[in-house]
Design a protein with these regions (language model features):
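C-terminal, loop-rich substrate-recognition/catalytic regions characterized by aromatic stacking residues
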Residues: 1-281
Length: 281
């Protein structure tokens, strides 16, 4: 939606539809907008492949950990807990999907609603950290009912605790990335799935057995962000639309009530797989 992006489209169509040599086919095959936090703080960069060959696929393991008495806030760690632990939350949250939980003010500006889902944060980053490429969230989950809606959001948290938003195509504030999955749709096509991109078949419903843990892989759309030194990477896992959802909201299934649980560590390690890009020498 940028001026340069529209110009690239025009150059592409001029080349193929009008036979005009715009030079676009002589450029590298991948062009990325490298976001550095905040509207207007970005730059264009050429690459030769996607995902980037130099990607360091890095697992950030979920670790439940109360901080300042907040039982819903855990940590993203380099190592998984040795023993399996868990965090539970209400499957319905405090609001109705499509009303307060998906409103402009509550999800786009004010941040996540209290007592809705659980969150995990890294420690303050010691250096600027670029994340560019596809993202996958692997969770071990259970529910007290037959299904479970999972809304995953990646956020850029400044040292003062505020969100660093980007600007969406309709000028709305947006977080770093989002992904969604209904647990009954978790079945994968092993031939088409990749370590960094699960491919769900959506051909049958695999209902949950109440209280029985299952493994799910959630695709979070490809993104790019340079998290600045001192910032935190935050992951929200919620039963409803979270921060930065407006105007594209969802309505959760009526049967998704009760209690959802996320497991971490031991044989049920949950993790966020991020494409960390090392600095070029």
């Amino acid at each position: 939606y940028s001026a340069e992006g529209r110009l690239d489209q025009l150059r592409f169509f001029d080349h193929w539809l009008k036979g005009i040599d715009t030079g676009i086919m002589s450029e590298p095959s991948v062009k990325l907008l490298i976001r550095k936090g905040g509207h207007g703080n970005s730059e264009w960069r050429f690459e030769n492949e996607w995902p980037l060959e130099r990607t360091r696929w890095t697992r950030f393991f979920l670790q439940p950990h109360a901080r300042n008495g907040d039982e819903s806030l855990g940590r993203l760690m380099a190592e998984a807990p040795r023993k399996t632990v868990s965090m539970s939350y209400s499957a319905s949250g405090k609001t109705k999907a499509g009303v307060a939980s998906a409103s402009w003010t509550s999800t786009a500006l004010a941040g996540s609603l209290p007592q809705m889902g659980v969150s995990f944060e890294t420690a303050p980053l010691g250096d600027d950290t670029e994340v560019t490429g596809p993202v996958v969230l692997v969770l071990w989950v259970a529910s007290s009912t037959e299904d479970m809606d999972i809304f995953a959001t990646i956020r850029n948290i400044a040292p003062d605790g505020s969100d660093v938003f980007e600007l969406g195509q309709q000028s709305q504030p947006v977080p770093v990335g989002k992904g969604w999955l209904r647990a009954s749709q978790r079945k994968l096509d092993p031939a088409l799935s990749l370590p960094w991109r699960p491919y769900h078949v959506h051909a049958e419903r695999q209902w949950l057995e109440p209280g029985e843990p299952v493994r799910v892989e959630i695709e979070i759309w490809p993104t790019c962000m340079v998290f600045k030194r001192g910032h935190r990477i935050r992951l929200d896992v919620q039963p409803r639309d979270g921060v930065g959802s407006a105007p594209y909201t969802h309505y959760a299934a009526d049967y998704n009530t009760g209690t959802n649980t996320i497991f971490a560590g031991g044989a049920r390690a949950s993790y966020l797989l991020l494409p960390v890009i090392p600095r070029r020498a």
